[in-house]
Design a protein with these regions (language model features):
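Conserved residues at the C-terminal ends of beta-strands
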Residues: 2-4, 31, 56, 104, ...
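Radical SAM [4Fe-4S] cluster-binding motif and immediate context
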Residues: 59-170
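A generic structural signal for well-ordered coil/turn residues at beta-strand boundaries
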Residues: 24, 49, 82-84
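Glycine-rich beta-alpha loop elements in corrinoid/cobalamin-binding modules
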Residues: 1-47
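Alpha-helical elements of Rossmann-like donor-binding domains used by nucleotide-donor carbohydrate transfer enzymes
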Residues: 8-11, 15, 27, 52, ...
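Conserved ATP/PPi-binding loop(s) of AMP-dependent carboxylate-activating enzymes
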Residues: 44-66
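Short catalytic/ligand-binding loop motif for oxyanion handling, primarily in non-cytosolic enzymes
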Residues: 8-11, 37-39, 46-48, 97, ...
C-alpha cells in the first residue's frame, strides 16, 4: 500500500532495481508473512513541488503498459483508452471525510491529507496545452481531483481566465 504521492517512487524503484530491501521505502506498507511493515510517511507535496513535476506523457512512441507488456503508445491506443478527452489531476487532498471514499484511509493515517495541495493555474494550463499539441484530436478535459471545487476561489478564477484565453476546448 502506498500512502503518499509521486516523489517516493524514485526511491522505491531504485531499491527494487538494485535488488535491495525495498520494504524500507518511506510511505509504503508491506506484508511479510503475517506481519505488516508500516513505514513512516514522507512529507506531503507542496505547491512548489507540484509545479516542478514533469508533465504527463501522451505522445506517439512514449511507452504504455498493456496486458501484453510495455509497448510504444500511438494515437490509436490513446483514443482507445481515453476517448477524445484529456484526463488529469490538478489537486490532491480533500477536507471531507466521506465514508465511501478511499481518501478517508489516507486521512486516518495522516490528517494533513485533508489539506488541498495543487500546482499553479499556469502549470496546469501549460500541461493541458502540451497535451493538446501532442494529441490534437482532444475535444474535452476531464479533471479527476479529490476535491476540485474546494480549491481556493482566487486560484479557480485565475485558472478560468487562463483556460478561456489559451485552451480552445471545453
Amino acid at each position: 500500500m502506498c500512502l503518499t504521492h509521486f516523489k517516493l517512487w524514485k526511491n522505491f524503484f531504485e531499491l527494487f532495481r538494485k535488488g535491495k530491501d525495498y520494504t524500507t521505502s518511506p510511505s509504503f506498507w508491506f506484508r511479510k508473512g503475517n506481519n505488516v511493515i508500516k513505514n513512516s510517511n514522507l512529507p506531503l507535496m507542496t505547491a512548489k513541488d507540484m509545479d516542478n513535476l514533469p508533465p504527463l506523457l501522451y505522445q506517439d512512441d512514449e511507452l504504455i503498459y498493456q496486458r501484453s507488456g510495455i509497448k510504444p503508445l500511438n494515437t490509436k491506443d490513446f483514443i482507445k483508452y481515453t476517448g477524445l478527452s484529456y484526463h488529469t489531476v490538478w489537486s490532491i487532498g480533500c477536507p471531507l471525510h466521506c465514508t465511501y471514499c478511499g481518501n478517508t484511509k489516507f486521512i486516518e493515517y495522516d490528517n494533513a491529507y485533508r489539506r488541498i495541495r495543487h500546482s499553479s493555474p499556469q502549470t496546469i494550463v501549460e500541461e493541458i496545452k502540451r497535451a493538446i499539441s501532442k494529441q490534437p484530436h482532444l475535444s474535452t478535459v476531464a479533471f479527476h481531483d479529490d476535491s476540485f471545487l474546494s480549491l481556493p476561489y482566487a486560484q479557480l478564477e485565475e485558472f478560468a481566465k487562463l483556460y478561456k484565453a489559451e485552451i480552445k476546448i471545453p
